[in-house]
């Protein structure tokens, strides 16, 4: 076996050194930029301008249609922490703050329901330390949301929280905490937050099928239809449709989330931004895009039906004769076709 020469070893070492130096420089530049941005944001004049700009943009968007149900796949917390050389816990905490900020915005825009993919059933396969960290953070955020939902001075006042998923996988203490928070916020009717924890779409549909079959056998109920099936899902009525699903961190997949809810004309947006960095303007542009195309679609549907009514009311003598032949007027295709290779 041929041993690598000293020059090759030095070249590999130099290459690694250059890569590490590049990463350190990128990290330093990002840190400086973040500090400068944080300093600018702390200026009272800039903060005043930013808040008023948000208010103007929100009022402008409320003029048109807004989605009733917006959902988030909150991906990128761990990479966010790793990029800043922070513990994984800090990344998840930053993600919690991002969700809270966007909930404020959605409620002000007039969105009735927000759902968030907080914990997949598959996440139980992660290291125990990280799972315990997520459970503890989830408990803290539950208490925080319950307090905000009952504080009339808080923007989330009058909100309702529902934890959906396979709660049999959670500890008795966690199930007790969830039940308490849901009871505290059950009177909220302005805004609903669904936290999917722990959740997968396959589990959601499996649970619904079991409940539907048991109900049919016990109560001799009529045939199971789509409406009844949908209402038995974890999110109940809100399982009917999700208008806008947003996933961050650059991955182009749904990760077994909201497969039933997005099957009917939903808009799915993918962002390369990590979840803790997902900002007001990023979400605003996505909702603005949804509102724009939703308005065009409704306009086209309305004018198309109006054109059909006008066309039907016009006497046949004034209607333009069709010169193109319809496909339905062609004879039936042959039963079989054989092709030879002869010249």
UniProtKB/Swiss-Prot annotation:
Induction field: Expression is induced in the stationary phase.
InterPro entries, sorted: UPP_synth-like (IPR001441), UPP_synth-like_CS (IPR018520), UPP_synth-like_sf (IPR036424)
Major subcellular location class: other
Catalytic activity annotation: n isopentenyl diphosphate + (2E,6E)-farnesyl diphosphate = a di-trans,poly-cis-polyprenyl diphosphate + n diphosphate
Signal peptide boundaries: none
Tagged with keyword Cytoplasm: no
EC number(s) given by UniProt: 2.5.1.87
Gene Ontology BP term (one): dolichol biosynthetic process
Record localization: Lipid droplet
The keyword rRNA-binding is annotated on this UniProt entry: no
A GO CC term assigned to this protein in UniProt: endoplasmic reticulum
Record pathway: Protein modification; protein glycosylation
Subunit-level organization: Forms an active dehydrodolichyl diphosphate synthase complex with NUS1.
Function of the molecule: With NUS1, forms the dehydrodolichyl diphosphate synthase (DDS) complex, an essential component of the dolichol monophosphate (Dol-P) biosynthetic machinery. Adds multiple copies of isopentenyl pyrophosphate (IPP) to farnesyl pyrophosphate (FPP) to produce dehydrodolichyl diphosphate (Dedol-PP), a precursor of dolichol which is utilized as a sugar carrier in protein glycosylation in the endoplasmic reticulum (ER).
Identification of the protein by name: Dehydrodolichyl diphosphate synthase complex subunit SRT1
Organism from which the protein derives: Saccharomyces cerevisiae (strain ATCC 204508 / S288c)
């Amino acid at each position: 076996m041929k041993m690598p020469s000293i020059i090759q070893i030095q070249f590999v070492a130099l290459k690694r050194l250059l890569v590490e130096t590049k990463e350190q420089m990128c990290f330093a530049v990002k840190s400086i930029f973040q500090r400068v941005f944080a300093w600018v944001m702390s200026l009272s004049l800039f903060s005043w301008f930013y808040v008023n700009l948000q208010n103007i943009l929100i009022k402008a968007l409320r003029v048109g249609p807004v989605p009733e149900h917006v959902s988030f796949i909150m991906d990128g917390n761990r990479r966010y922490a790793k990029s800043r050389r922070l513990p994984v816990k800090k990344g998840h905490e930053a993600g919690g703050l991002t969700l809270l900020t966007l909930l404020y915005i959605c409620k002000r825009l007039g969105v009735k329901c927000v759902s968030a993919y907080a914990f997949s059933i598959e996440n139980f396969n992660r290291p125990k330390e990280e799972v315990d960290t997520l459970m503890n953070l989830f408990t803290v955020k539950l208490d925080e949301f319950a307090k905000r939902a009952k504080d009339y001075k808080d923007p989330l006042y009058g909100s309702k929280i529902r934890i959906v998923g396979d709660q049999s996988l959670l500890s008795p203490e966690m199930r007790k905490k969830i039940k308490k928070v849901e009871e505290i916020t059950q009177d909220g009717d302005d805004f609903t937050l669904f936290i999917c924890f722990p959740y997968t779409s396959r589990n959601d549909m499996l649970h619904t099928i079991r409940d539907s079959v048991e109900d049919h056998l016990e109560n001799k109920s009529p045939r199971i239809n789509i409406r009844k099936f949908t209402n038995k899902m974890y999110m109940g009525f809100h399982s009917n449709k999700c208008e806008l699903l947003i996933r961050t961190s650059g991955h182009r997949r749904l990760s077994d989330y909201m497969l039933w809810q997005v099957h009917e004309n939903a808009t799915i947006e993918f962002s390369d931004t990590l979840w803790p960095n997902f900002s007001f303007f990023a979400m605003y542009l996505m909702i603005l895009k949804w509102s724009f195309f939703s308005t065009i679609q409704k306009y086209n549907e309305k004018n198309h039906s109006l054109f059909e009514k006008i066309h039907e009311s016009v006497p046949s003598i004034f209607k333009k004769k069709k010169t193109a032949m319809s496909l339905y007027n062609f004879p039936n295709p042959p039963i079989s076709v054989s092709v030879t290779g002869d010249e």
